[in-house]
């Protein structure tokens, strides 16, 4: 059954193109210092070129990173790539307050992507053996979450209009030979800006939120000196 969260405001923040590490630290700080009344948030960001290793990551799946940095992350899953033209959406949801479980959230995120792609006439599906969203046998969206004190952070990475070559330098999500695809390969001309409003609308619909309210984002708001730092992002 779909959760109904009409009474729970959700805030949307547009971050633009950002390096991974400071945004990850900001997300950790937000989660660490949020309270029972803090509204849930969605962050939309494109990251500068980076490989991130999830908690289950193994070094043998990083084949030839070359000039792209590899950063350890505390999200679920294994290694993936982020770069310009890929829409990352971080979802900071108080699961306790929403009375939903992790599996429900994962399903909602996967359905968000499936419905977003359907809007652009792309058929896709989730797989029970490998989190994410796929078009036939090719992966188009990766997913990795972390739960702390009953609240989610991290989220999804949807390939839209990017250079897919760096995925050849890794075994994406720990699968040797995993083929990647993107929205623009299936529907030429579609951009990140085209996808963003559909993605946000579908996520709020999946969880029954009211319309997300766009508010400004400043990194300095999240990296205050009183906030603790973390070496694992």
From Swiss-Prot:
Location of the protein in the cell: Cytoplasm
Q: Which organism is it from?
A: Yersinia pseudotuberculosis serotype O:3 (strain YPIII)
Signal peptide start-end:
none
PROSITE patterns, per database record:
BPL_LPL_CATALYTIC (PS51733), LIPB (PS01313)
Q: What is the protein name given in its UniProt record? A: Octanoyltransferase
Q: Where are the transmembrane segments?
A: none
Q: Which residues form the active site?
A: 173
In its keyword annotation, does this UniProt entry include rRNA-binding? no
Residues reported in the UniProt entry to bind substrate: 75-82, 142-144, 155-157
Q: Which InterPro entries match?
A: aa-tRNA-synth_II/BPL/LPL, BPL_LPL_catalytic, Octanoyltransferase, Octanoyltransferase_CS
Report the GO molecular function annotations. Answer: lipoyl(octanoyl) transferase activity
Which GO annotations describe the biological process of this protein?
protein modification process
């Amino acid at each position: 059954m779909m959760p109904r969260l009409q009474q729970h405001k959700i805030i949307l923040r547009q971050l633009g193109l950002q390096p991974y590490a400071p945004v990850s630290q900001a997300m950790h700080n937000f989660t660490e210092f949020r309270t029972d009344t803090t509204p849930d948030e969605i962050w939309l960001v494109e990251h500068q070129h980076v490989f991130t290793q999830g908690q289950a990551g193994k070094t043998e799946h990083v084949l030839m990173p070359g000039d792209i940095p590899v950063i350890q992350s505390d999200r679920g899953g294994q290694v993936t790539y982020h770069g310009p033209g890929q829409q990352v959406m971080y979802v900071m949801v108080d699961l306790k307050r929403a009375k939903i479980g992790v599996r429900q959230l994962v399903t909602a995120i996967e359905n968000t992507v499936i419905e977003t792609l359907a809007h652009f006439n792309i058929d896709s599906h989730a797989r029970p053996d490998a989190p994410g969203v796929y078009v036939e046998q090719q992966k188009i969206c990766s997913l990795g979450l972390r739960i702390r004190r009953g609240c989610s952070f991290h989220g999804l990475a949807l390939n839209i209009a990017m250079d897919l070559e760096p995925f050849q330098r890794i075994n994406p999500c720990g699968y040797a030979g995993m083929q990647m695809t993107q929205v623009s390969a299936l529907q030429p001309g579609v951009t990140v800006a085209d996808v963003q409003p559909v993605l946000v609308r579908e996520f709020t619909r999946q969880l029954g939120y009211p319309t997300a309210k766009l508010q400004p984002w400043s990194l300095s708001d999240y990296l205050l000196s009183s906030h603790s730092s973390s070496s694992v992002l």
